[in-house]
From Swiss-Prot:
Coiled coil: 391-525
Keyword ATP-binding among record annotations: yes
Protein name (record): Chaperone protein ClpB
Ranges annotated as spanning the membrane: none
Amino acid sequence: MRLDRFTSKFQMAIFDGQSLALGRDHQYIEPAHLMVALLNQDGSTIRPLLTMLNVDISQLRSRLGELLDHLPKVTGIGGEVQLSNDMGLLLNMCDKLAQKRKDKFISSELFILAAVDDKGSLGKLLKELGLTAAKIEQAINQVRGGQKVDDQNAEENRQALEKFTIDLTERAEQGKLDPVIGRDDEIRRTIQVLQRRTKNNPVIIGQPGVGKTAIVEGLAQRIVNGEVPEGLRHKRVLSLDMGSLIAGAKYRGEFEERLKSVLNELSQEEGSVILFIDELHTMVGAGKGEGSMDAGNMLKPALARGELHCVGATTLDEYRQYIEKDAALERRFQKVLVDEPTVEDTIAILRGLKERYELHHHVEITDPAIVAAARLSHRYVSDRQLPDKAIDLIDEAASSIRMQIDSKPESLDRLERRIIQLKIEQQALSKESDAASQKRLNDICEELDVKEREYAELEEVWNAEKAALSGTQHIKSELEQARMNMEVARRAGDLNRMSELQYGKIPELEKQLDLAAQAEMQEMSLLKNKVTDAEIAEVLSKQTGIPVAKMLEGERDKLLRMEDELHQRVIGQNEAVEAVANAIRRSRAGLSDPNRPIGSFLFLGPTGVGKTELCKTLANFMFDSEDNMVRIDMSEFMEKHSVARLVGAPPGYVGYEEGGYLTEAVRRRPYSVILLDEVEKAHPDVFNILLQVLDDGRLTDGQGRTVDFRNTVIIMTSNLGSDRIQENFGNLNYEGIKNMVLEVVSQYFRPEFINRVDETVVFHPLGQENIKHIASIQIERLVNRLKEKDYELTVQESALDFVAKAGFDPVYGARPLKRAIQQYIENPLAQEILSGKLETGKPIDLLIEDEHLVTKQ
């Protein structure tokens, strides 16, 4: 008996039978061993065949186990087992049956056919289970679908549709698909193309996230509900699973074999199946090796003959890149374009999906949350499409609330972490004996007592609220199941079941749900069970960094006092501070133009008067950190070709994949302060790029992606006209100086550039009083740095006047002051600290003696 005459599945089963015999210490491989191996085999034909014959497989397994238990055990056979006489006869019988059926290879289902006529123990067992040769013959013909066994992998490629596709109509019947709201025109156009005589293959094209796959799911639901023309009724929509088709195809030709078997089975279905290929472009080039044919070319003949009813889905870019290049494949498909839905349509879609998400997360989603998700995602998430980005917001907001219910609330979690931190510190300090450590230990013990009491109270409240919330979850799940059963009964025409559900169970569950919801209505302090617009805004703020959440009282006060905050670091520039503060307030109050940046400013003035410092202060005010400022030194963009660095190199140039310096920074952090320092030093072509940013708040980078600048503050600084300011300071008022400077600026910048800037602010030169104020700020920073080293520095008024006078230079602004502080204070202090003259913990006085700065302790 030659093993290579068997199919690969049958060969594997024989080897598995041999292992089974060895494991049980049997000397011979009996038919029962092979039968058990065939039943246990993954993807075998035997199990579906026996299921078709109404055989109880678990009963068969237990009876086979009994047969094997009665076989004699032989120890010490050294791992050698042989085929028994019965087994040899059965395999020869299988060979005869294969020849009779004109098969090139012997397949595993013939073993059952041979065994049922056998007079051995397996034959008797099969007869007892009600099997006959005629019944098995009939089932084999059905499984094979009229095909002969022509190659060794024939069994693996059988029932290819079951293995390599997902039945969407079946999932629609079971209620596993999300409802499809709207998209009637696109579904109607898809049905229209499917009804054609030839080229009846629609390809659904649209941006990622607009709902292409949902259209096919909507078609499957309509077929199930009978809401389609007569020509499409009772058809099945099968989704091709490319992953399963390619996975495990190790040898050349194996992938093509699988695809061919799928196409053969589809042609046998005679048009009763619509094949859906998601990501259609993956078919072009799939399985293409050296000289072999790819999947796209294998589909062409079936598509042209109309044997294959196919619906494809792909994005615009991939359609252009893969399918349009292959004109022969493209002409076999008819395009159905899917546009992004409007905000109103998205709200309708979200209302339809609401119940599914409520059921999954066991939370309630309010209508304001749905409206906020659609509107806010449309405005602030510019690089993705509706409805996908709005659904994401709803999903994540519901998930965060569910997480807070299931795990500890954030406030409780923070308290617990703080308690652990204090306990660790307590343990460490208990080993120290010095006075400072003991003082800190007492403070920690007091704080620990307070925190532990607070934690115990909060935990009690949390447990009570959690118990109250779990009431409605069970009722909601039951109600959803009852509605699904109602739909199944409606399709089956079971009127008794329908009336029982519609007038009995469903109203009763709805009543229970209302009562449970009323019990939940009392205000909860820790847990929430509702997704509101505030949660949506919070999730969006976390995703994009743009503050769209409702302002808390503290933030309102902070914005109203914004000038005072900025004046703490920027001295003597009232106009500039006011202009910037007003722009930020307009934005946070929601009054700024949604299609332009929050504010764009051109800061003009001499060096060292606080132009760059104001930008840093603004970034610090808005984000609590100067790191969120995108600083671009325009002196680096003096050559014409350096413009490409801002938006990214064009295709074909080195660095094309890397993206632009400005565009990438804003894509990653859409809410930021952009400082274009020394803007007049840049090449004039740079300003042409800035025109779109200042007017429309958008810029297209080197890769064709639109970058959104609508949530940025753009500040450009320049020294233009600073000589005029110095000459006329004191002679003219602010307006007069401003007009003179703008005259110089208009000669340098184009009118269309100046016209797009929201406000041009001219900075004042700094006077003696301003310099003194700045000196006190900078010395205060030095005092704080020394405090960290345990030195207490006190600066006398006379010393402050001395430094301010030494650092005053009307031409260079505040920068000479920094040098004066270094020269007169920091350098002598550093020397005295290093030489050991100054001791820690004792006060140090900085004062004037004989017109010199001296330190005394």
